[in-house]
Regions:
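Accessory terminal helices/loops
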Residues: 1-152
């Protein structure tokens, strides 16, 4: 993990209130090299659903993934818990215990996040897992009416 030298790490402008060192380092690298991180396996990964199903199978099934995820959660290993459960939820979106534990995991990660955007993504992800995605499936009638009145130019 990359860390700033202690001589500048605690300066207000260098704190992770918006961006984070880990993201900024990646952004600097990507500015020169694009999205690719240099790992060949990341060139053409499986789609999340297919990858999730294969991970769940490789780990030994849904019950085994849940067992390992609960152990990791109880040990405070929230990033590993999120990784395990993310695969399970993509493999089986209707698995309620996995969705609930993943929501709890995202909440813990959100509470610990110094970065505002990270906190927002974690807590919004937790809410979406338990309450659904806001506005999904609802037509916006104003937008439809507006688009009918726009010219193609």
């Amino acid at each position: 993990m990359i860390k700033l030298p202690s001589s500048i790490a605690n300066e207000f402008a260098n704190r992770g209130y918006y961006g984070t060192v880990s993201h900024n380092v990646k952004a600097q690298y990507q500015m020169y090299f694009g999205w690719f991180d240099g790992i060949p396996a990341h060139l053409n990964p499986l789609p999340p659903v297919e990858e999730g199903k294969k991970y769940v199978e490789a780990i030994g099934g849904e019950d085994e993934v849940m067992k390992k995820a609960r152990e990791a959660y109880n040990q405070g290993e929230y990033r590993w818990t999120a990784t395990l459960l993310n695969h399970l939820v993509f493999a089986n979106p209707k698995h309620k215990p996995a969705r609930q534990l993943l929501a709890n995991t995202y909440a813990q990660l959100g509470y610990q996040a110094e970065s505002g955007p990270w906190r927002n993504f974690y807590l919004t992800g937790a809410m979406e897992l338990t309450e659904g995605i806001a506005g999904k499936g609802k037509a916006n009638s104003n937008r439809a009416r507006m688009s009918q009145n726009l010219s193609p130019e």
